Design a protein with these regions (language model features):
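N-terminal, intrinsically disordered, basic low-complexity segments enriched in Arg/Pro/Ser/Thr
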Residues: 188-219
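Asp/Glu-centered strand-loop micro-motifs enriched in Gly/Pro and often flanked by an aromatic residue
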Residues: 6-17
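Sequence-structural signature of the catalytic-core scaffold of metal-dependent phosphohydrolases
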Residues: 1-3, 13, 24-29, 33-59, ...
Length: 220
């Protein structure tokens, strides 16, 4: 992460703010918010452990940019443009139309979920994160064919899952009690990533406090 796009490019001093320092700062803020929410939850649900909520949000926040390619959104556009080219089209011949769309509209958030759950050389289950952590990480719980071009709600244009990872996310949703979203925009559309992660962690720990915090998924 340290050598990826700087959040503030071309600094005029020696204070370099990279994706690594950005992610560490977001994780720190997330941990504090998670602890605050966890304490509030504990007032209503005695079996909620505030530190669990804090750890879930911190882990999700630390990983929130892990799927971003070099050069950030410009890198996403470059990958998508390649797969829309004649040469890229040939590389996609064996895929379904939905799988092709995943790459023609490449999204770092979807790649991040894939990295966390699959792309680990010595494991078929990625980083073995808990269901609650993966639920909190997933900012845009939809595939590319479900993303909508809604100018009033920019986040609805994004997707956070590839077709190959839908079953894994279904397991995450089932373990954590996440509900299928209605089609109309919700109140969380324009909230920050840390706030969304905190809400997801809150929903998860409230639904099944002891189970989802410890449950690790197996990827088929």
């Amino acid at each position: 992460m340290h050598d990826k796009t700087q959040v503030f490019p071309l600094p005029e001093d020696d204070v370099v703010h990279s994706r690594l320092t950005h992610s560490l700062e977001v994780a720190s803020v997330g941990r504090s918010l998670g602890k605050f929410v966890g304490l509030k939850l504990q007032e209503r649900h005695s079996n909620v452990v505030p530190d669990d909520v804090a750890n879930i949000v911190a882990a999700a926040a630390l990983a929130h940019d892990i799927g971003n390619p070099p050069f950030g959104h410009a890198g996403e556009d470059a990958i998508a443009e390649f797969f829309r080219s004649p040469e890229g089209e040939r590389a996609l011949e064996s895929l379904t139309e939905s799988e092709r769309r995943d790459l023609k509209a490449f999204e770092g958030n979807a790649q991040g979920f894939r990295l966390l759950t699959r792309l680990q050389l010595e494991s078929d289950n990625g980083l073995h994160l808990t269901a609650a952590t993966l639920a909190a990480f997933t900012k845009y719980p939809r595939t590319s064919d479900k993303a909508l071009g809604d100018e009033d709600h920019a986040s609805r244009k994004k997707h956070g899952l590839m077709q190959a990872d839908v079953d894994t996310f279904r397991s995450v949703a089932q373990e954590t009690g996440l509900m299928e979203r209605v089609t109309r925009p919700s109140a969380t559309e324009n909230t920050s990533g840390v706030a969304r992660a905190t809400m997801a962690a809150t929903a998860a720990t409230s639904a099944a406090p002891s189970a989802c915090v410890k449950t690790r998924l197996r990827v088929s």
